[in-house]
Regions:
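Sec-dependent signal peptide recognition
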Residues: 2-10, 17
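Flexible loop/hinge segments at secondary-structure junctions
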Residues: 20-136
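N-terminal short leaders/motifs
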Residues: 11-13, 63
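Generic hydrophobic-segment detector
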Residues: 10-11, 35
């Protein structure tokens, strides 16, 4: 029985990886295109504006698959390292982490309604007319 459960779990992991698309960083219509290094600086609070546009990033909830993928693919960090970075930064008065939203729909709504809004979603959630800032 345990062997069957392990096999089913392994198949589920493979299927999940196959279904997961690329991560896209989306921005409000006034947000310019960014490279990965600029996205890293935005999500670590080192850039608060890009090309004269004040940036207001949001993040997925801690522990979600999309956040873990974003941290790995874009930030080259895991959750523990990223959270630790922001704990220190907040302690020394150098900023606060991006607000966390609970669903892709919330991220999309925030980005579309907030000048300078930036967030990340799975490519499968992308809709026509969205401003894709970068993808990976």
């Amino acid at each position: 029985m345990k062997k069957k459960v392990k096999i089913l779990f392994a198949i589920a992991l493979i299927f999940t990886d196959v279904q997961a698309g690329d991560i896209v960083v989306i921005g409000n219509s006034n947000v310019p295109k960014m490279d990965v290094q600029t996205v890293q600086k935005v999500y670590t609070g080192r850039f608060v504006s890009v090309d004269g546009v004040s940036i207001s990033p949001v993040s997925a909830k801690s522990g979600t698959l999309i956040r873990n993928r974003f941290l790995q693919d874009f930030m080259n960090q895991d959750e523990e390292k990223y959270t630790g970075y922001w704990t220190v930064r907040r302690y020394v008065g150098k900023g606060t982490p991006p607000n966390e939203l609970g669903s892709p729909e919330e991220v999309i709504n925030y980005v579309q309604s907030t000048p300078g809004g930036v967030g990340y979603i799975d490519e499968a959630e992308l809709k026509a007319g969205m401003n894709v800032v970068t993808r990976k």
